[in-house]
């Protein structure tokens, strides 16, 4: 099976914001999640309209966005490097996540297994990443995409569209947890991020002050916890 890829152009208020190589599905979720995870909107109530072209190559969004936030986004985008085609890699001074949520390691490891079980396209092709959102006992959202950033954006967007509060969720990912993914979680207000892969030093550095729990190599019945262990019931707050 050959994976279908498209270049989707996200247009905000008549101006191109970003172009992303992605799977041509759940693009409404992707757009909403991207805007939230880049700090441009607080939630779906800021969006007046959102439409996807029939060929899945153009996503048109009309939304109330603070001009200063848009300027800051474009400055970050100009500085960003690597495969994170968003602007998150240049993040500094992230806000502390306002959440009292915590999770048990057993629940998170169980949900990682659920995410892997749901990853049908990966099993068929071996060419996509998966991401999911959980409240602990339940897997609430799931997405696959060519890029780990896109998959995370789709999950965040789906939760926003379903009015699921992000402050009570953990994001799970099959991809490396780097600074750009961590900053997406922070700007969206997600308190816990768990990866099946590695966590980078800059992600750990940014997660500590933001009070985000980060964990990597979550496989079988083990994980490495790097920051905010209280959110996994492993320390006092």
Roles of regions detected by a PLM:
Residues 118-164, 170-171:
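Histidine/lysine/aspartate-rich catalytic loop segments that bind and position anionic ligands
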Residues 42-44, 56, 162-165, 235-236:
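Short, glycine- and charge-enriched coil/turn segments that flank and shape catalytic ligand pockets
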Residues 133-134, 226-228:
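Short beta-strand-to-turn element immediately C-terminal to the catalytic PLP-Schiff-base lysine
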Residues 33, 39, 84, 126-127, ...:
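Glycine-centered flexibility sites
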Residues 229-237:
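A charged, well-structured terminal subsegment
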Residues 38-39, 87, 119, 159, ...:
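Structural signal for hydrophobic packing residues in well-ordered secondary-structure cores
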Residues 148-225, 234:
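Feature captures the catalytic cores and cofactor-binding loops of soluble hydro-lyases/lyases
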């Amino acid at each position: 099976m050959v994976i279908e890829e498209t270049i989707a152009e996200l247009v905000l208020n008549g101006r191109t914001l970003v172009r992303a190589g992605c799977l041509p599905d759940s693009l409404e979720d992707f757009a909403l999640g991207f805007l939230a995870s880049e700090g441009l909107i607080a939630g779906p109530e800021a969006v007046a309209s959102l439409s996807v072209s029939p060929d899945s190559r153009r996503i048109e969004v009309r939304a109330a966005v603070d001009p200063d936030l848009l300027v800051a986004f474009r400055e970050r985008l100009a500085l960003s490097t690597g495969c994170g085609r968003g602007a998150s890699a240049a993040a500094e001074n992230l806000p502390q996540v306002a959440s009292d949520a915590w999770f048990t390691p057993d629940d998170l490891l169980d949900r990682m297994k659920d995410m892997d079980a749901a990853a049908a396209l990966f099993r068929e092709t071996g060419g996509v990443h998966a991401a999911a959102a959980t409240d602990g006992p339940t897997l609430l959202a799931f997405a696959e995409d060519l890029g780990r950033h896109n998959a995370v954006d789709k999950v965040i967007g789906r939760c926003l569209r379903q009015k699921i509060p992000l402050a009570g969720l953990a994001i799970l990912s099959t991809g490396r947890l780097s600074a750009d993914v961590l900053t997406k979680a922070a700007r969206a207000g997600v308190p816990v991020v768990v990866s099946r892969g590695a966590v980078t030093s800059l992600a750990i550095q940014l997660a500590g002050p933001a009070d985000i729990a980060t964990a990597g190599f979550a496989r079988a019945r083990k994980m490495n916890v790097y920051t905010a262990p209280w959110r996994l019931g492993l320390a006092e707050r």
